[in-house]
C-alpha cells in the first residue's frame, strides 16, 4: 500500500480517503483458489475465473444479482458435480489470505486525521470471511477501521462503473476533487 505524504495530502485539502479491499488491504492468492476448486472437482475453473476481470456467475455474485445459494448452485452446475456449500465456500474463500497487521495499524492511524471509507468489489461469502478472519485485530473489528463500508454486492453495482463512485460520493457527502 502506497500512501502519499501526509503534509501533501493536508495541503491539498484531502479530508476523506476511499480505500479498496482486494489486493490493497487484503492479500489475495488466485492460484490457491484455483487449486482448491480443482481439488473438489472443478477442473476448468481457469476458464471461468478470469485473471483480470470477473464475469458470468462471479460478477453476478459480486454485484449482488444472485444470492450465495444461487452462486453455489451455479458452481455445482458448472462443475457437473454435487459438492457441499462448505466445500465451495472453503475453495472460494481460499482466494483471500490476510490483512497484514501493519495495514490495520495504518488504517487506525489514518482514522485519527481522515474520514476513511471502504469501497470494495466483493460478495457476501467473501465479506463474511473477511469480517470474521481478516479484520479482527487486538480489540478492533471492521467497524473500527472505516466510517462506512460500501460493498458492491450490497450496492448492486461494481467498480469501475462510474455509478458506484457517484453513489458513494453522494451518500458520504464527499466532493471528489
Name what the model sees in each region.
Residues 1-8:
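N-terminal amphipathic/basic-hydrophobic helices that include classical n-h-c signal peptides
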Residues 120:
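Short beta-strand/turn micro-motifs composed of small residues
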Residues 9-10, 170:
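Short amphipathic alpha-helix with an adjacent loop that forms part of the alpha/beta core around
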Residues 11-101, 105, 112, 123-129, ...:
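N-terminal helical cap/lid subdomain that shapes the substrate entry/recognition surface
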Amino acid at each position: 500500500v502506497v500512501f502519499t505524504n501526509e503534509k501533501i495530502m493536508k495541503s491539498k485539502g484531502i479530508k476523506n480517503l476511499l480505500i479498496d479491499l482486494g489486493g490493497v488491504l487484503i492479500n489475495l492468492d488466485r492460484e490457491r483458489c484455483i487449486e482448491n476448486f480443482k481439488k473438489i472437482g472443478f477442473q476448468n475453473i481457469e476458464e471461468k475465473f478470469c485473471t483480470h476481470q470477473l464475469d458470468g456467475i462471479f460478477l453476478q455474485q459480486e454485484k449482488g444479482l444472485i444470492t450465495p445459494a444461487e452462486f453455489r448452485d451455479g458452481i455445482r452446475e458448472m462443475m457437473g458435480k454435487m459438492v457441499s456449500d462448505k466445500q465451495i465456500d472453503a475453495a472460494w474463500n481460499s482466494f483471500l489470505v490476510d490483512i497484514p497487521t501493519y495495514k490495520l495499524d495504518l488504517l487506525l492511524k489514518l482514522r485519527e486525521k481522515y474520514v476513511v471509507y471502504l469501497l470494495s468489489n466483493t460478495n457476501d461469502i467473501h465479506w463474511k470471511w473477511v469480517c470474521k478472519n481478516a479484520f479482527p485485530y487486538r480489540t478492533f473489528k471492521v467497524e473500527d477501521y472505516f466510517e462506512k463500508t460500501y460493498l458492491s454486492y450490497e450496492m448492486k453495482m461494481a467498480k469501475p462503473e462510474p455509478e458506484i463512485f457517484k453513489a458513494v460520493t453522494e451518500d458520504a457527502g464527499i466532493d471528489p476533487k
